[in-house]
Amino acid sequence: MRCPSCSSLDTQVKDSRPTEDSAVIRRRRVCMACNFRFTTFERVQLRELTVIKRNGRRVPFDRDKLVRSVQISLRKRPVEPEKVEKMVSAIVRELESAGEAEISSEAIGEIVMEHLRKLDDVAYVRFASVYRNFREAKDFEAVLGELSGDEMARLAALRLK
């Protein structure tokens, strides 16, 4: 593993432990050249996925990009990081187990929205507004209309706070 500080390849693992759900191994490493300490994470990858973008371009699937987009939609929301990690892992497993090497960005967006809807209504609406490229208030109304009555009541209560 290359040191992120000095780029040396001479690093050692000082500590390894699985995460709570044992889906990821966390490794603490130290660079033997500059003594910089850093953490890496190791997870199983079932298959290489390629994302077909809206413009037809094909790019490798990037789990970190998925995490960032989910975190943006959850910004300032009371959701524990462990729940976010579990959700992202579930999304990736779903994508990998679909049996396809290529998947459209639209399909990924729909899967993310499905999972966000179960996790946090506000994050669901935020993600939908970017993913579906909302341009007018009626676009928000349409997504809010998709939510069930209980979810609508919670969103209305949030607006009153």
UniProtKB/Swiss-Prot annotation:
InterPro entries: ATP-cone_dom, NrdR-like_N, RNR_NrdR-like. Keywords: ATP-binding, DNA-binding, Metal-binding, Nucleotide-binding, Repressor, Transcription, Transcription regulation, Zinc, Zinc-finger. Negatively regulates transcription of bacterial ribonucleotide reductase nrd genes and operons by binding to NrdR-boxes. This is Transcriptional repressor NrdR. Coiled coil: none annotated. Residues 1-20 are annotated as: Disordered. One of its GO terms (biological process) is negative regulation of DNA-templated transcription. One of its GO terms (molecular function) is DNA binding. Residues 49-139 form the ATP-cone domain. Its cofactor is Zn(2+). A zinc finger (unnamed) spans 3-34. Binds 1 zinc ion. Belongs to the NrdR family. HAMAP family: NrdR. The lineage of its organism: Bacteria, Pseudomonadati, Pseudomonadota, Alphaproteobacteria, Hyphomicrobiales.
